[in-house]
């Protein structure tokens, strides 16, 4: 082996071909694995600190993300919060509304800058994915949300008769589009979030009968897959329901350890409760302690019951800011945010 590696002619030929490949295909097209043992992956905050922690910092930049779950589980809310975070940091975001169901009022309530949000409402799946591909290739857009995979109806299906049997059209469309999009994302740094619905497999008597729409290509191309579920309806006395408790399982993660769990509250009309997320992590890290129903900070009781503790922190933003900083430091997330980088040794 040493005789081969010390051959100067082979080393010279190797350097020549590596330089030629980089000239033809760009810097980083080929490299020695040891030169990039730790891959730098910038992240986009999700708007929920608990979810950021579960994903290893946030949504990875330049990657494909899939968020799937039942109806009214919080998929669109999470995506809109990510858009708001990108815009707050001065980035550009696009929303491809294949379902034609985007609510501008709700989006604005979540912090989305409606005036500067790029929105497309294409008539068919080919148009939607072509728009996404062109935005990715432009390298001028930081985040694209596609809502949803189930609504990406192929043109042939739209133009055909209602009774026509067309097998696998959408799966083939997704497979072809993802091949194009994935090849351009690494160079542009654009993140694409696909929202997806669940269906039931017919005739399944054992195992999980749930399956996502659009075939299997998205499962392979996605660096992160999030399974989001509504686990509780939030109620307050005579006021009735005011939100839901959502649980997210990181079903796949190529840039951080997978299978982590995150929970957070989604308040109707307001979105993710940031203070609620921070309180949960503060209790988890010991920044805030709970004995029975009482929550304490630095030895002083601040509230009885979780709702009152959240209210206290909302009414005392200075305390909330200090607690948030301590939580981030304890979780080693103090530098995480839009454009920041963390490291992974995951082999793609």
UniProtKB/Swiss-Prot annotation:
Spell out the GO cellular component terms annotated for this protein, sorted alphabetically and separated by semicolons. Answer: cytosol
Keyword Isomerase among UniProt keywords: no
Q: Which residues bind ATP per the record? A: 69-76
What superkingdom heads the lineage? Answer: Bacteria
| Gene3D superfamilies on file | P-loop containing nucleotide triphosphate hydrolases
Which GO molecular function terms does the record list? Answer: ATP binding; ATP hydrolysis activity; ATP-dependent DNA damage sensor activity; damaged DNA binding; single-stranded DNA binding
Q: Which SUPFAM superfamilies match?
A: P-loop containing nucleoside triphosphate hydrolases (SSF52540), RecA protein, C-terminal domain (SSF54752)
Q: Which CDD domains match?
A: RecA
| Keywords per UniProt | ATP-binding, Cytoplasm, DNA damage, DNA recombination, DNA repair, DNA-binding, Nucleotide-binding, SOS response
Where would you find this protein in the cell?
A: Cytoplasm
Main location (coarse class): cytoplasm
Question: Which GO BP terms sit in this record?
Answer: DNA recombination; DNA repair; SOS response
Signal peptide segment: none
- Which HAMAP family does its entry note? RecA
Q: Which family does it belong to?
A: Belongs to the RecA family.
**Its biological purpose:** Can catalyze the hydrolysis of ATP in the presence of single-stranded DNA, the ATP-dependent uptake of single-stranded DNA by duplex DNA, and the ATP-dependent hybridization of homologous single-stranded DNAs. It interacts with LexA causing its activation and leading to its autocatalytic cleavage.
The protein here is known as Protein RecA
């Amino acid at each position: 082996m040493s005789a081969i590696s010390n051959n100067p002619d082979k080393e010279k030929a190797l350097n020549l071909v590596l330089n030629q490949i980089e000239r033809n295909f760009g810097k980083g097209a080929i490299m020695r694995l040891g030169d990039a043992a730790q891959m730098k992956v910038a992240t986009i905050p999700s708007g929920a600190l608990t979810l950021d922690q579960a994903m290893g910092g946030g949504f990875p930049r330049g990657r494909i993300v899939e968020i799937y779950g039942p109806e009214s589980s919080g998929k669109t809310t999470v995506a809109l919060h990510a858009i708001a975070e990108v815009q707050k940091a001065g980035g550009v975001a696009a929303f491809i509304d294949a379902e034609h169901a985007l609510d501008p009022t709700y989006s604005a309530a979540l912090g989305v800058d409606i005036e500067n949000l790029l929105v497309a409402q294409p008539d068919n799946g080919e148009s939607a994915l072509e728009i996404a591909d062109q935005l990715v290739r432009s390298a001028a857009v930081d985040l694209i949300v596609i809502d949803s995979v189930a609504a990406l109806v192929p043109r042939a299906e739209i133009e055909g008769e209602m009774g026509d049997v067309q097998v696998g059209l959408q799966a083939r469309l997704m497979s072809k589009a993802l091949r194009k999009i994935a090849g351009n994302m690494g160079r542009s740094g654009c993140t694409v979030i696909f929202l997806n619905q669940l269906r039931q497999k017919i005739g399944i008597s054992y195992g999980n009968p749930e399956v996502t729409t659009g075939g299997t290509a998205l499962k392979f191309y996605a660096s992160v897959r999030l399974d989001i579920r509504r686990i509780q309806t939030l109620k307050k006395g005579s006021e009735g329901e005011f939100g839901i408790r959502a649980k997210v399982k990181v079903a796949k993660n190529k840039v951080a350890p997978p299978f982590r769990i995150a929970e957070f509250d989604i308040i109707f009309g307001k979105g993710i409760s940031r203070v609620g997320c921070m309180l949960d992590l503060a209790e988890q890290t010991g920044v805030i302690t709970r004995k029975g129903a009482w929550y304490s900070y630095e030895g002083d009781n601040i509230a009885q019951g979780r709702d009152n503790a959240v209210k206290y922190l909302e009414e005392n933003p200075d305390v909330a800011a200090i607690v948030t900083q301590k939580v981030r430091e304890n979780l080693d997330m103090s530098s995480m945010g839009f454009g920041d980088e963390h490291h992974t040794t995951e082999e793609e």
